[in-house]
Structure formats: structure tokens, C-alpha cells
Amino acid sequence: NITDWNSLFWIAHPGGPAILDQVEAKLALKPEKLEATRHILSEYGNMSSACVLFILDEVRRKSAANGHKTTGEGLEWGVLFGFGPGLTVETVVLHSVSA
């Protein structure tokens, strides 16, 4: 059981700022957990499903630049989720590799 959602790295599809705000609030996520998502949203907008690949690459690059031991911000496990029409959600559990 996960008791602290901050113990994971997050690759979240940026459906929009309001959705990200709600995810952050409901899961009690620290703002930095969705930092890569918000950065990609501000730089490129909502690119549909391709967004998660851009966010995954952003997290990977930042992890390496910051000297983290894994590609997932130094964490072993993460979550990737995307939003679809009618507010459907697809979720994948990720296992990070060494940087």
C-alpha cells in the first residue's frame, strides 16, 4: 500500500491546469511532483497523448542533470497517467532504471 504519493515520480498528462491542481490537491502532492508536467504544458500546450513522452523525457533529462541515481528523479517507482475524452484515465506503473 502506498501511504505517501510523494514517494513516486509522476508523469502526468496535462489535461489542463485545473485538472493538475485537483490531482495535486487530492493526492497531497508536493508542487515539484508535477513540475515537469507543468513545464511541458507551458512550453508546448496540450499535445494530446504525445505529452506524456515529452514529460517522460523531461524527467529523465532533469534526473541526469541533477545527478540522481535513477531516471525517475532518484526514485525507483513512478506513475504515468493520461486523460481522455469524457475524463477517462489510463494509468501505468513505471519502474525506473539507473541513470
Curated annotation (Swiss-Prot):
Predominantly in developing fruit. The keyword rRNA processing does not apply. Its EC number is 2.3.1.74. It comes from the Eukaryota. Gene3D superfamilies: 3.40.47.10. GO terms for molecular function: naringenin-chalcone synthase activity. It catalyses: (E)-4-coumaroyl-CoA + 3 malonyl-CoA + 3 H(+) = 2',4,4',6'-tetrahydroxychalcone + 3 CO2 + 4 CoA. The keyword Protein biosynthesis does not apply. InterPro entries: Chalcone/stilbene_synt_C (IPR012328), Polyketide_synthase_type-III (IPR011141), Thiolase-like (IPR016039). Pfam families: Chal_sti_synt_C (PF02797). Pathway: Secondary metabolite biosynthesis; flavonoid biosynthesis. One of its GO terms (biological process) is polyketide biosynthetic process. Keywords: Acyltransferase, Flavonoid biosynthesis, Transferase. Belongs to the thiolase-like superfamily. Chalcone/stilbene synthases family. The primary product of this enzyme is 4,2',4',6'-tetrahydroxychalcone (also termed naringenin-chalcone or chalcone) which can under specific conditions spontaneously isomerize into naringenin. This is Chalcone synthase RJ5. It comes from Fragaria ananassa.
